[in-house]
């Protein structure tokens, strides 16, 4: 029982609202900003087992039902769990969640997609609630916690739906997020202008870096969450800093322009990657012309 106790308590609390629609138990817990919940500590995974969190993490199952529009997903979870438990082997809930999301969406979404959406839905709670969108009781919940971008090094757990909400300056800035795990995280740049004019941009990695810009006059927030890979959970660290404005041609950012930068550029051409630092002629593509210009820079 204890191995997956978080799942049992999560389901029981969610089903209480299904059986008794007027129940305010879950809403009351999620409205409290002074306890550990998926809103006050978004960095916790969906299986965090301490501080009565499993009861409050019923928000995760509530999210799945509301976002996917199919309450049968909870039944699929329990049916699959029962079959695997009957085999006598240890049961991991994460493949079960992944299969359930895949099933109710006919393959259109994965658990990684659900984690990304869950991150967005949790951000728009409390004072940030948007009428008619996201959680139907979002305005009654605590406003999700954010971090300051002045804390340049961040950590989240992989594979389990952890999130970080990072407030950025209301300025025109070029920024870069760097990590050794670019495939294990998902990043959105969220900009809110004049109240409810919301723009959400999905950022794509360029090697181990995510480049983006913020705008003056808008609330700028970075939403970072872990993807699902099926591997054991590890700590993912990432840093946030101003965009790199070093030497032209210094592709590997080691402070000099030399043959190592040529090697890095050629590797990017072969792998199809695109990093702005390698686009020497700024034509938004990396090819032999950039190699020629880089060699000229080295020889000059």
Regions of interest found by a model, annotated:
Residues 1, 7-11, 161, 225, ...:
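Functionally constrained cores in energy, signaling, and assembly domains
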Residues 2-67, 78-117, 122:
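Acidic/His/Gly-enriched intrinsically disordered linker/tail segments
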Residues 17, 26, 38-48, 97, ...:
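Generic preference for hydrophobic/aromatic residues in regular secondary structure cores
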Residues 72-75:
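Acidic/polar loop patches that form or flank catalytic/metal-binding clefts of enzymes
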Residues 83-246:
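Beta/coil-rich, acidic/histidine-enriched accessory regions frequently appended to metallopeptidases
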Residues 243-300:
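Cellulosome-associated attachment modules in secreted, modular CAZymes
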